A protein has these predicted regions:
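N-terminal intrinsically disordered, cationic/polar leader segments
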Residues: 1-151
Length: 151
């Protein structure tokens, strides 16, 4: 009957959402493992940015240079975003495993995924991580669209 059909639809939607969570997790792990996040790669990018500052010919005082370098290093660190994405994936899986009306909670989670993927893109100063961030945003959009179909 109608209840059986709704249960089947619900199971199919759950499987689809779990697939999106798997994709979000895989992209998060790719960003985490990206070679651009190695300290040597970050140092090289910082050195290049500092060189550009110095080449601009403007007088640069030592304190300002240290401040800029610290700022650039902090901006490049996406550890928190990666940790939060992993936590949100685990939360999504728990919600889907629990069953029941989880639409509103998953909608909130999709907003969190969106926020973290946006931050990942804006913080990234490596093309490879930005590309992963953009892929992540696409999967998050698909996840959010499917969540809209939930009760």
């Amino acid at each position: 009957g109608l209840d059986a059909a709704r249960r089947e639809d619900g199971a199919a939607l759950r499987d689809l959402l779990l697939g999106h969570l798997d994709a979000i997790e895989a992209l998060t792990l790719r960003a985490e493992a990206d070679p651009s996040r190695e300290p040597a790669a970050i140092r090289a990018r910082l050195a290049e940015q500092v060189r550009l500052l110095l080449d601009a010919g403007a007088p640069v005082d030592e304190a300002r240079l240290h401040m800029e370098a610290a700022f650039l290093a902090a901006k490049a660190d996406i550890r928190e975003e990666i940790d939060r994405l992993k936590t949100h994936v685990a939360s999504g899986r728990s919600l889907l495993a629990a069953g029941g009306p989880v639409g509103r909670k998953l909608d909130f989670l999709s907003q969190e995924f969106n926020r973290e993927s946006n931050t990942l893109c804006s913080k990234s100063n490596a093309a490879s991580v930005t590309a992963i961030g953009l892929e992540l945003k696409a999967v998050v959009d698909q996840f959010r669209e499917q969540v809209q179909n939930l009760e």
